[in-house]
Structures are given as structure tokens and as C-alpha cells.
A protein has these predicted regions:
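N-terminal domain-start signal
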Residues: 1-209
């Protein structure tokens, strides 16, 4: 990767890092005596919070998701190769595919669980799940969705969405790694996959207990 090509991105990322909650700000939120007090403290930071709306809806995740998406979109506009950002954001794409597949297989509307982040829009992913085809996503993603469908049609397992999207998330990471052919990306991808596997192992161990 050309360091000069990423100089503008580096500057933007440093600015965004400075907008992260400081230890003092986070502690101030944690010791708040009420939700309203916590939201008012958060409102004084870079997070855009409609205090009254959150108090009425009790839905806090959309605030965090919206902030994350703003930062993602800002970096996406500047980055020379979007594949680099995919290394970190493709997990949200596969999360959304899981949600949409489970919604399709179960007949339940679960779309509110989607996270508005990643290179591919909700409409694009929804069209992929509905038709098992798309001109706007990589072939590996289409292949994963088709395999999940085949498993569900053969065995009726809702878990097919989890099993195949997890598997193809790893495959997609490896594909990005091979395509970019950068040692630092290879190391990052290895660490990410190792951490996911460790998390899965710990979760499975706890469930057996």
C-alpha cells in the first residue's frame, strides 16, 4: 500500500479517534443517576443524541449505530481501496445477511436487527436473499446465501443462516487477504479469525455447562 495515498485517511482517522469518549467522559456517563442524565452527558460529546426521543423509545442502539455509520461513511469517501475497510466492516454485512435469511426462513420480520453499516445497502442485501442472486455483490456472497438456502430446504434448520454466514464471513476475509496481498492485512485477518474462533469456543463451553 502506498503510504502517501492514505495520508488523508490517516489524518481523518486521527481526528475521529480524538472524538472517542475519554475515560472521564465514560466514567461520567456510567455514574449517572438516571438515563436522562446519562444521555445529557453523552449529548455533550460527538454523539448526536435526541434525548427526548431515546427516553420515549428506550432504544439506544440506533444512536450508537448511526454514529458508527457516520464515521464509516466519512472514511469510505476518502479511502483509495474500499477492500481495506471491508476487512473491518464485512462482519456487519454477514450479520445482516444472517438476519435477512432468518427472517426469510422463519417468516418473521427481523429486519429491525440489521445494522446500517457496510459497503452494501440494505436493499441490495435484501434483494440477494430474496432472489439468491445479485449483480452488485461478490460471487462468494451469492454462493454463501445459496448454500444456506440449500441446507434449509434439505433439513429445515434455521441455524443454516448462522452456520453458512459465519463460514462465508471467514472465506470472504481470506479472499480479501489474498486479493490485497499485504503482510499487515494477512496478520490482521489471522488475528480476527483467531479471536472469532476463541469466542465461539468459549460460548460453546459455557453452553455445555
Amino acid at each position: 500500500m502506498n503510504d502517501l495515498a492514505y495520508s488523508g485517511v490517516n489524518t481523518t482517522v486521527r481526528i475521529l479517534e480524538q472524538q472517542l469518549l475519554s475515560k472521564e467522559q465514560l466514567n461520567g456517563i456510567l455514574v449517572s443517576k438516571s438515563l436522562q442524565q446519562a444521555l445529557e452527558a453523552l449529548q455533550k460529546t460527538s454523539y448526536e443524541v435526541d434525548v427526548q426521543e431515546v427516553l420515549e423509545s428506550r432504544q439506544f442502539d440506533p444512536v450508537l449505530d448511526a454514529h458508527l455509520k457516520r464515521n464509516y461513511d466519512e472514511v469510505l469517501e476518502l479511502i483509495p481501496d474500499a477492500s481495506l475497510l471491508d476487512v473491518f466492516s464485512i462482519r456487519y454485512t454477514y450479520h445482516n445477511l444472517k438476519v435477512l435469511l432468518k427472517s426469510k426462513f422463519s417468516g418473521k420480520d427481523l429486519k429491525h436487527l440489521c445494522i446500517p453499516l457496510g459497503r452494501y445497502s440494505f436493499d441490495t442485501l435484501n434483494q440477494l436473499v430474496e432472489t439468491q442472486d445479485s449483480l452488485d455483490v461478490p460471487d462468494i456472497m451469492i454462493e454463501g446465501v445459496r448454500e444456506a438456502y440449500a441446507d434449509f430446504e434439505n433439513f429445515g434448520r434455521l441455524e443454516a443462516a448462522d452456520v453458512f454466514m459465519d463460514r462465508y464471513y471467514f472465506k470472504h476475509l481470506r479472499l480479501i487477504d489474498r486479493t490485497m496481498n499485504q503482510e499487515v492485512i494477512h496478520q490482521i485477518v489471522n488475528i480476527m479469525i483467531d479471536m472469532e474462533n476463541i469466542t465461539t469456543l468459549i460460548r460453546a463451553t459455557k453452553q455445555k455447562q
